[in-house]
Amino acid sequence: MAGNRYFEDQPYEVENPFNIMITLSPFDIDLSTTIMMPKTLLEANLFRFMDISYLVGLLQVPNKPKVIELFDIDTKITTFLTIRRDGDNFKFHGWNNILERKHYKAGDVIAFWWDLHHTRLNFKHVA
């Protein structure tokens, strides 16, 4: 959902210390259905903002993925992905649905940040 009558979409802020900056690897864009993010990065920059029951389910039930909402701040398109722990990383399954609309290359930098008002993960191509 793009905005609502109470809160605008939270824009990308360069100076936000909780931005999750991911440099895309060839694996992330070449026929991949997932994008991987390190657990330590998500612990520091994302988990603190999530609902505790969601987070407990994600961390304590390893074989049960959780659905997460990703919102493209530029196109205002929402995509639902599943997130699952994989060792010391988390994989976001369904990434290929975003790749179908975007023309990312290896080396592109994507910023992800939690939108507190809409309880979703926003993202933007920044470099």
Swiss-Prot record:
Which Gene Ontology terms cover its molecular function?
DNA binding
Subcellular localization is given as: Nucleus
**Gene Ontology CC: one annotated term:** nucleus
InterPro entries associated with the record: B3_domain, DNA-bd_pseudobarrel_sf
Keywords associated with the record: DNA-binding, Nucleus, Transcription, Transcription regulation
* DNA-binding stretch(es), residue numbering of this chain: 35-127
Under SUPFAM superfamilies, the record lists:
DNA-binding pseudobarrel domain
Does Repressor count among this protein's keywords? no
Superkingdom, taxonomy of origin: Eukaryota
Could you confirm whether the keyword Phosphoprotein appears in this record? no
This chain belongs to the protein called: Putative B3 domain-containing protein At4g12617
Species per Swiss-Prot/TrEMBL record:
Arabidopsis thaliana
